[in-house]
Amino acid sequence: QAKTIVVIHGLTSSKYSSGVLLASGILYKSGFNVLAMDMRDHGDSTCEDGYYSAGQKESDDSAAVVDWLVNEKNISANKIGIYGQSLGALTTLQTGAKTQNFAAIAVHDPPVAFETLVREEMEFQGFPPSLYTPVLHYARIFRGENLTEVTPEVAIAGGNKQPILVFNGMLDKRVLAHHTDDLIKIANDNGVEITTYRYEDMGHVESLWGYNEEFGKVIVSFFNENLSS
């Protein structure tokens, strides 16, 4: 079986988005199997309730896809990688809390602390960051969901030290650059190998296009080195 990459889109996006198609095409042309998935309430997947659960349920979806590759397609876990963009990168990082059937992950402008992300987004939109607290309580009381239960830190700490590749646009105004700093610290604290490519002139996931040639070379090399032949 060829090395296989699961590709995960961002919020309100789908497997048909230009970013997912571009990254998937690069990987496919380089000899990888590619499975671009739709998270629940996105694209062709079931519309469960129309709510985004900060990766809590979405990581169930990514874990189910990875486990399906192992259990139904007989692809060894050491041949499977995951690549996610934006909030799909958050889901990618959370997947390790649900399954260990993968060997490496790559993420593009990943949020790491969801609470911080929401507060920053509220401020960006002109709302008081303090509104996050009632949103969190609403999710717990009326939706029965703890939006901060499964975090990248929890997943990485309990994982198999799968290496991480990060692409980060330093001009990102939606997922601020400190999230990548936080991820680097989490990885280092847990003895996980992490490689970062940071771009001072790029915004949110823009380096996929602005540094497309470098992106292709780096991600292909990363997965070839960290997935078994």
Indicate residue ranges for each PLM-predicted region.
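The serine-hydrolase catalytic nucleophile loop
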Residues: L11-I26, M39, H178
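Catalytic active-site module of serine/aspartate enzymes centered on a nucleophile-bearing elbow/loop
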Residues: G210-S229
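Catalytic histidine-centered segment of alpha/beta-hydrolase-like enzymes
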Residues: R174, M202-E213
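Hydrolase active-site cap/lid region
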Residues: Q94-E145
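Alpha/beta-hydrolase active-site loop
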Residues: Y52-K73
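Short beta-strand/loop motif that positions the catalytic acidic residue
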Residues: G159-N160, V166-N168, D172
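Conserved alpha/beta-hydrolase
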Residues: S24-T46
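Conserved alpha/beta-hydrolase "acid-adjacent" motif
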Residues: K173-H179
